[in-house]
């Protein structure tokens, strides 16, 4: 704990700290966030902009075999330069590590649950529920905006589209719609779901 305090005590006006990872203004840091209760770690990149601004969180790999989103986020995190960034970006590269490793399409192998259906999760639950709780409490709670990347797996061909949430009140619906309009996609669909990663974050 004392070493962690020393690492993250730079005193800068803009700082992004998650678990044992700390990025100060103009820095990009990578590391791991341990899931509540142990068992797995989540790979993160923190990008702390040189200028102050809101915090965006982007996640991928909620479904382990949806590799396109994982690749896209990996490329984005490499390309973003914190010195040219206003605000912060939290990149959760793989939300479902064992499914990603073992090519399991829809579920967390250890408990057979669909991670995208157990949010906001449980602190003392099964692995899926603890992953969801960790993402909710340790990552989403720090974000002003959130994008969850999904894709077809290797056997699917999916038209690019974006869902935006309209179930969490007028203000969030308006912000979500504006984010969807900024996406370069022809298909945009409103959603009243409440249990997925992004839907739960809106509540």
Q: Model features per residue range: what roles?
A:
Residues 1-4:
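Intrinsic-disorder-associated, low-complexity terminal segments enriched in Asp/Asn/His/Tyr and depleted
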């Amino acid at each position: 704990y004392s070493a962690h305090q020393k690492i993250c005590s730079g005193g800068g006006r803009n700082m992004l700290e998650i678990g044992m990872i700390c990025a100060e203004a103009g820095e990009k840091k990578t590391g791991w966030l341990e899931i509540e209760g142990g068992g797995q770690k989540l790979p993160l990149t923190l990008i702390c902009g040189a200028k102050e601004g809101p915090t965006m969180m982007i996640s991928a790999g909620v479904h382990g075999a949806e590799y396109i989103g994982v690749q896209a986020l990996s490329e984005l995190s490499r390309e973003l330069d914190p010195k040219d960034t206003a605000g912060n970006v939290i990149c959760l590269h793989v939300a479902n590590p064992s499914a990603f490793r073992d090519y399991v399409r829809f579920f967390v192998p250890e408990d057979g649950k669909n991670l995208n259906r157990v949010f906001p999760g449980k602190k003392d639950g099964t692995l899926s529920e603890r992953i969801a709780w960790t993402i909710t409490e340790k990552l989403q709670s720090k974000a002003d905006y959130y994008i969850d990347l999904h894709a077809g797996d290797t056997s699917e061909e999916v038209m690019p589209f974006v869902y935006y949430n309209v179930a969490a009140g007028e203000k969030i619906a308006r912000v979500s719609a504006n984010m969807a309009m900024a996406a370069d996609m022809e298909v945009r669909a409103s959603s009243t779901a409440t249990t997925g990663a992004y839907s739960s974050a809106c509540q």
